[in-house]
Amino acid sequence: MASVPATMTAWTKTRPEVGGFAQVEHAVPSPGAGEVLIKTQSTSVCGTDIHIWKWDEWSRENVPLGTVTGHETSGTVVAVGEGVSTHSVGDLIAVECHLACWNCPRCEEGNAHVCENGSIFGVHGHGAFAPYFVVPAVNARHVPEGLDPGHASIQDPLGNAIHTLTGGPVEGATVAVHGLGPIGLFAVNAAKAMGAAKVIAVDWDNTYRMSLAKELGADLVLGKDDDVVAAVLEATEGRGADNSCEFSGAASALSNAIHSTRMGGYVNVLSVYGSGTPEVPMNEVVFRYLHLKGINGRKMWSTWDTMHDLLSRNLIDVDKVITHRMGIESFEQAVQLAMEGNCGKVVLDF
């Protein structure tokens, strides 16, 4: 670690208020047994970072003040801890932010993304809006050869999109994507790349992102001026979508997804509903034999395998989804831009 400085300046949640971030000096961490020290290359802004910026109820309950946040990231290994044989100095990696114990029943059954003893990198502990960070080596995933570090940093949201899509049929199916934030945009692109016969993209009034969805392959784009349920049924000869994916966190979008999915179809939900629990038309779910499923994170590691296959074959148009790249000094501007929504994915480079 001779070339690694002793201290660093990192964006830190210091005050219990909207914004509330400051650049604070921290010691550069040393990797413990089974860990790697990473020099950050790129970290992207996530919806979770916006929740933390707003200091909403979820953030107040989960994020300790003084935490360096940021969890969608890529970087280069600069030191390895005792017992690490899977990584070498110089390796480019991306982080799986769900830190698992690997011993509980959920981990042992292959669901480490919902580990009973798990925590989230950059939420419950220090993350990657910093020049250096440590993670368990198992969470430092090697990236496809030649991948741009900025592209490598978005594997968290791309993986979310793929995990949600694969909760139902994709190849040859009609897939409806409700909510066109960055994850929804990746879902549109990935659904096409994975062989969906038709992709229907739905948002409220973000014309910027609706246009992006069209460029990424959506066959039909719907907005606030459309009767979403009627339009989806018309586009599917009255049957409904085979696989509806809800990314918006809007109660109306969940209702539309349920009512516009075919008999025996799949409704996969990767959303946090911030304004109370949405009403779920359970009679529709029961009598139409709908498969309603909550999605959290990425399967470890089948989602990553699928994602790396798509990236290696250049089937994901990452450059279209990443609309803004800034230096880390522009962190506050980047979060504001992401909140306003006139963007796709915002990436901060170091």
Question: Predicted segments — roles?
Answer:
Residues 2-8, 39, 226-227, 255-259, ...:
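C-terminal hydrophobic helical "lid"/dimerization subdomain
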Residues 12-30, 47-79, 94, 115-124:
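N-terminal glycine-rich cofactor-binding segment
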Residues 29-43, 58-105, 144-146:
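Glycine-rich beta-strand-centered segment in the early N-terminal region that forms part
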Residues 62, 99-178:
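NAD(P)H dinucleotide-binding glycine-rich loop of Rossmann-like/cofactor-binding domains
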Residues 145-226, 230:
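Mid-domain Rossmann-like dinucleotide-binding core that forms the NAD(H)/NADP(H) cofactor-binding site
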Residues 201, 214, 219, 251-313, ...:
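Glycine-rich phosphate-binding loop and adjacent beta-alpha segment
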Residues 228-238:
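Short amphipathic alpha-helix with an adjacent loop that forms part of the alpha/beta core around
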